[in-house]
């Protein structure tokens, strides 16, 4: 089996990741180690948190908002209104809530386009307590750009709208972690929604001239995480 070192550089806004990894040219399915369901779950969770972190870093700043949308008694009753008598309550209510958040996103997109306002968001439908892992009352977490916040907030009529600015730091790993740990895992899905106008990370791959290369951050940067084959840093703004 032929192997050689490759370097991957991922640019997510002001956050840069520099990764060295061993690449195999003829790896077969038989070469891959079989993983337990728990190992697969943790691997998928790590991937989803990584991807959402990069998406947030690319598109949102400390000026933007982290929003929690709740359901009042009347709002929750509306979610259950059309539930068939024998249908399980939790899956039905969860799907009904997902329909409501998608309606809100579509409505906000329409009104923002009408007003000439850019609208960007990432959202999850949450019903898990991140501390106890028990079921929690259903709600939504949304990251919204500041320009669209006034319109977005005015369109939610099912309960309260709780807002705060996103964390004033370049790396939004903990925000992505907080959002996804409250979402039930569904195989084959990212478990978060987004508007289609979000920028994607820029990924560059190359074969390093020196396989023993030491990853060193530039001078005008703040190191977020550093290891032998992995470096994540934020470029300092002038």
Segments (PLM) and residue ranges:
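Right-hand nucleic-acid polymerase module
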Residues: 1-136, 146-238
